[in-house]
Amino acid sequence: MKHGKNFILGEYVIIKKPELVEVGDNVRIADFCRISSACKIGSDCEIAPGTYIAGGDGKYTFEMGSYSSLAAGVKIWLSSNDYVNELVTHSVPCVKEIQGNVRLGKYTGVGTNSVIMPGNDIPEGVTIGALSFVPSGYKFEPWTVYAGQPIRPIKKRNR
């Protein structure tokens, strides 16, 4: 794992493939987080307790822009079963999955217990409210607050 200055790694953090993780300066990954995919985390970021970043087995990447945060319990998925085809399990190699990178631009924030599915490009300045669900390929506008299930724009954000 490569990391910059002032990096703080909490207790009981699991990083399954540290060789696929890069972290900038002034970053904190809090207790009880689990990272099992490729990650590029910018500077001045925080990942709060209980956050889970998973899927893709190194083929896909989670990228977090500088000055961004993930609140407690956020789940970022780079791969997921589509739950509409024959088998609903992750243990069988022939299962059709939804897969893709997830990118958060600079100055973004994701609220507590939100779920972000594969294949999302979240632009600069977007915030996502607590308990929100972001389906694959959702189209965001920069500097906007989103929330809900289904997710929807709430209002513009100050720069």
Task: Tell me what each language-model feature is.
Residues 11-23, 28-121, 144, 149-150, ...:
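Flexible, glycine/small-residue-enriched loop-and-beta-strand segment within the central core
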Residues 113-126, 132-136:
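Beta-rich strand-turn-strand
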